[in-house]
Regions:
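Flexible, glycine-rich beta-alpha linker
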Residues: 95, 118, 140-154
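NAD(P)H-binding glycine-rich loop region in Rossmannoid oxidoreductase-like domains
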Residues: 38-80, 92-97
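Conserved Rossmann-fold NAD(P)-dependent oxidoreductase catalytic core, especially the SDR/UDP-sugar
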Residues: 75-119
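Conserved glycine-rich Rossmann-like NAD(P)H-binding loop of the short-chain dehydrogenase/reductase
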Residues: 29-38
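N-terminal Rossmann NAD(P)H-binding glycine-rich loop of SDR-like oxidoreductase domains
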Residues: 4-27
Length: 154
């Protein structure tokens, strides 16, 4: 008998999360689509967590929601350690202020708290740091770039 592979997708209602849920289901995962207003899902076994929650276009108008999505909720997932693995979706926007010619993962980041646009970058960087510091060696970060919709998307 094969063990059930469980996945929890945080941010399942968003563009990436929605497509990831479909992909995981096709791969035979039992997928829990964690909703923003749902309570209690953090208290159970989460399996493989894909952390897709976040704000993009309206982050500047919603600073508290941005920090909550990128950091606070992530902390509530990481703290009890009820996951097998976790992938935190970050962004290559963290490289925007870099003076380097090419973006590489270990390049120093130039983030300026006084710049309103850097709220997004700082909150994503803090989410990454939290994964590295509190992920128990089971959290990974993926910095995505240029996620687009193609003709086959609904």
């Amino acid at each position: 008998m094969t063990a059930v592979r469980r996945a929890t997708v945080v941010g399942a209602a968003g563009f990436i999360g929605r497509h990831l849920c479909r992909h995981l289901q096709r791969q035979g995962f039992e997928v829990h689509e964690a909703a923003r207003d749902e309570r209690g899902w953090i208290d159970g076994p989460l399996g493989h967590v894909f952390y897709c929650a976040g704000l993009t276009a309206d982050f500047a108008q919603r600073p508290h929601d941005t920090v909550d999505a990128h950091v606070s909720l992530l902390d509530r997932v990481l703290r009890p350690q009820r996951f097998h693995s976790l992938v935190y979706l970050s962004s290559t926007r963290l490289y925007d202020g870099s003076l380097a010619e090419a973006a590489v993962e270990d390049a120093p980041l130039t983030l300026q708290p006084g710049q309103p646009r850097h709220l997004f970058d700082l909150s994503k960087a803090l989410g990454e740091a939290l994964c590295h510091a509190a992920g128990g060696g089971r959290a990974r970060v993926a910095r995505l770039s240029c996620v687009v919709k193609d003709a086959s998307d609904d």
